[in-house]
């Protein structure tokens, strides 16, 4: 009897995630606001914006879109996996959600982080002259911010690759059983 009560209480604690999921949806609202603000800024300066600034603005918008997609993916998958099944109002259900287990979600998150990091590096590359001009010429490599940003990006890439390989090995071993 005590065991059943404990199990029921533990299972009910999944609903503690629901307010966190709602709070994460507010993050989407904030990202949407920042996206629209950046888009408006870009459009309002269209006649004076340089090509480099246009590309940087576009990369910023892509970055925000990736981030919003990542938040939405984690939000929906977390709710569906841990809280409750989503009741679809219409037939346009999200098909990837049915096939997304925890390992697939980890892989999608890892790949999204790599994409976001790559966009960040691309933005830095577009303003490389400004960044390099702010660094003294005899600065050691370990004090160069671009060096560390590339290292961090490579760590993200290696982590995503290791997660994919680990997932692939685990899946192939489970397939045989």
Curated annotation (Swiss-Prot):
<dbReference type="InterPro" id="IPR005134">
    <property type="entry name" value="UPF0114"/>
</dbReference>
<feature type="transmembrane region" description="Helical">
    <location>
        <begin position="145"/>
        <end position="165"/>
    </location>
</feature>
<keyword id="KW-0812">Transmembrane</keyword>
<feature type="transmembrane region" description="Helical">
    <location>
        <begin position="54"/>
        <end position="74"/>
    </location>
</feature>
<dbReference type="InterPro" id="IPR020761">
    <property type="entry name" value="UPF0114_bac"/>
</dbReference>
<protein>
    <recommendedName>
        <fullName>UPF0114 protein HPG27_173</fullName>
    </recommendedName>
</protein>
<keyword id="KW-1003">Cell membrane</keyword>
<feature type="transmembrane region" description="Helical">
    <location>
        <begin position="102"/>
        <end position="122"/>
    </location>
</feature>
<feature type="transmembrane region" description="Helical">
    <location>
        <begin position="15"/>
        <end position="35"/>
    </location>
</feature>
<keyword id="KW-1133">Transmembrane helix</keyword>
<dbReference type="GO" id="GO:0005886">
    <property type="term" value="C:plasma membrane"/>
</dbReference>
<dbReference type="Pfam" id="PF03350">
    <property type="entry name" value="UPF0114"/>
</dbReference>
<keyword id="KW-0472">Membrane</keyword>
<comment type="similarity">
    <text>Belongs to the UPF0114 family.</text>
</comment>
């Amino acid at each position: 009897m005590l065991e059943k009560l404990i199990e029921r209480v533990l299972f009910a604690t999944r609903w503690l995630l629901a307010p966190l999921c709602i709070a994460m949806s507010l993050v989407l609202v904030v990202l949407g606001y920042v996206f629209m603000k950046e888009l408006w800024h870009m459009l309002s300066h269209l006649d004076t914006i340089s090509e480099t600034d246009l590309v940087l603005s576009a990369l910023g918008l892509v970055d925000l879109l990736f981030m919003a997609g990542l938040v939405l993916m984690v939000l929906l998958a977390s709710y569906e996996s841990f809280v409750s099944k989503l009741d679809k109002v219409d037939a346009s259900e999200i098909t990837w959600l049915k096939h997304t287990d925890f390992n697939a979600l980890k892989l999608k998150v890892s790949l999204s982080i790599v994409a976001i990091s790559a966009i960040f590096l691309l933005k830095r590359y577009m303003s490389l002259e400004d960044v390099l001009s702010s660094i003294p010429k005899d600065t050691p490599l370990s004090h160069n911010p671009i060096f560390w940003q590339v290292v961090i990006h490579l760590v993200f890439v290696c982590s995503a690759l290791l997660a994919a390989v680990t997932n692939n090995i685990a899946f192939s071993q489970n397939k045989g059983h």
